[in-house]
């Protein structure tokens, strides 16, 4: 999946996460993480974001994660929504999700 424009998903409310994703000229996923629980769960949050993008076939992107204590299922859903919006996908491959 090719990221072609900037997109966001989520909110900055408690127990949610705001995901911003945009195109990158360099290969790979560049990830910026801000979280209330970064010391304790930062590595796990980063792993979930990278795994979710890999399942969707995203190979290059700039990703910003502003976490306010979201559960893993919420994090995955927000990453998926932002990536699909950024790729302007109209036909969703549900099996990949």
Swiss-Prot record:
Task: Supply the Pfam families for this chain.
Answer: ACP (PF06857)
Give the subcellular location.
Answer: Cytoplasm
Q: Which residues carry this modification: O-(phosphoribosyl dephospho-coenzyme A)serine?
A: 14
Q: Which family does it belong to?
A: Belongs to the CitD family.
Instruction: Share what the entry says about its subunit structure, partners included.
Output: Oligomer with a subunit composition of (alpha,beta,gamma)6.
Tell me, what does this protein do in biology? Answer: Covalent carrier of the coenzyme of citrate lyase.
The protein's name is Citrate lyase acyl carrier protein 2
Tell me which species this is from. Salmonella typhimurium (strain LT2 / SGSC1412 / ATCC 700720)
